[in-house]
Swiss-Prot record:
A single GO BP: alkaloid metabolic process
EC number: 3.5.99.13
Family membership: Belongs to the strictosidine synthase family.
Domain of life, per lineage: Eukaryota
Main location: other
Reactions mediated catalytically: 3alpha(S)-strictosidine + H2O = secologanin + tryptamine
Gene Ontology cellular component annotations, sorted alphabetically: plant-type cell wall; vacuole
InterPro entries named among the record's database cross-references: 6-blade_b-propeller_TolB-like (IPR011042), Strictosidine_synth_cons-reg (IPR018119)
Subcellular location: Vacuole
Entry annotated with the keyword Transmembrane helix: no
Protein name per Swiss-Prot or TrEMBL: Protein STRICTOSIDINE SYNTHASE-LIKE 11
Keyword flag Hydrolase: yes
Residues carrying a glycan: 37, 79
Length: 329
């Protein structure tokens, strides 16, 4: 299984490189190759300064990108994350020692950066960076196994995050998808109480999550089921969930678009041979698809993991790709 997974990652990386020839012809699209032997800038976060972005990559590092300087090291999940063992760790190689940051988001009031590490649990990084502090790797005595998406409520500071599966770890992601595993979960962490709570269970590949701009609900994607659910956190429906949309194919990370009420969703078509036709899909607060931007000419047939709008540009991540992309709107 591991050999086939590594082979798939290698193929996806090759496709990502080959597509770069086409993308350089697009003046509105910019590639920001990840330095060294790291890959997979999966998600993005922006601090209060508004200068550059933060992203997690293979081997357990969090990088900060500065427009005039490029990528610099900001933080690491474990002490080993900066070692030669973790430099060049392909896909899920050595995830138990190195870590693999998946979802990331700032608490804009405190400056703390929260990270859902796929293999090692929920972490927090102080505004100065450095070694991440583990908050939790289990709830109720049950290990998370495979964390994925994360968002922070900008008003309350409550952290919402997902687990792709409670049966399979990151090394067995293909098996989780192939068997249509439905043991994913949706959690919240309240920093004021230091307690993790399970909000939803029985999810099929729960990937991205995003708090709405008015703070009334959280969207939770089900990659395997091509479905997005809405979990209410305020109002008469608080504590209940419902289907939000089935119109987005294999949704990964979900990001709110400022105060507009809309969201960007990273989407692919999961075929028998692997992910294909990546796209950025904008949906309204009512679940209506407003816009679809094809990304195949820029990323090839790879798994685009996040589309995050910031100051008139889309920041696009890829789970296995060698670069982050910026698309001007």
């Amino acid at each position: 299984m591991m050999r086939s997974f590594v082979s798939l990652i290698s193929l996806l990386l090759l496709l990502s490189f080959s597509s770069s020839v086409l993308s350089t012809k697009k003046s509105s699209f910019q590639k920001l190759p990840v330095p060294g032997n790291r890959t997979g800038p999966e998600a993005f976060a922006f601090d209060s300064t508004g200068k550059g972005f933060y992203t997690g990559v293979t081997g357990g590092k969090i990088l900060k990108y500065l427009p005039k300087k490029g990528y610099v090291d900001f933080a690491q999940i474990t002490n080993s994350s900066k070692s030669s063992l973790c430099d060049g760790a392909l896909g899920t190689t050595n995830v138990e020692k190195c870590g693999r940051p998946a979802g990331i988001a700032f608490n804009t009031k405190t400056g703390d950066l929260y990270v859902a590490d796929a293999a090692l649990g929920l972490h927090v990084i102080p505004r100065r960076g450095g070694l991440a502090k583990k908050i939790a790797d289990s709830v109720g005595g049950k290990p998370f196994l495979f964390l994925d998406g994360l968002d922070v409520d900008p008003t309350t500071g409550v952290v919402y995050f997902t687990s792709f599966s409670s049966t399979f770890g990151p090394r067995d992601v293909l098996k989780a998808v192939a068997t249509k595993d439905s043991t994913g979960k949706f959690f919240k962490y309240d920093p004021s109480k230091k307690v993790v709570t399970v909000l939803m269970e029985g999810l099929s590949g729960s990937a991205g999550c995003a708090v709405s701009s008015d703070g009334s609900f959280v969207l939770v994607g089900q990659f395997t089921k091509s479905n997005i659910k809405r979990y209410w956190i305020k109002g008469s429906k608080a504590g209940t969930s419902e289907d939000f949309t089935n119109s987005v194919s294999n949704p990964d990370n979900i990001k709110r678009i400022g105060s507009t009420g809309n969201f960007w969703v990273a989407s692919v078509v999961n075929s028998a041979t692997g992910p294909t036709n990546p796209s950025a899909v904008k949906v309204s607060s009512a679940g209506k698809v407003l816009q679809t931007i094809p990304l195949k000419d820029k990323f090839g047939d790879t798994l685009v993991s996040e589309v995050n709008e910031y100051k008139g540009q889309l920041y696009i991540g890829a789970l296995f790709g060698p670069f982050a992309g910026i698309l001007k709107l």
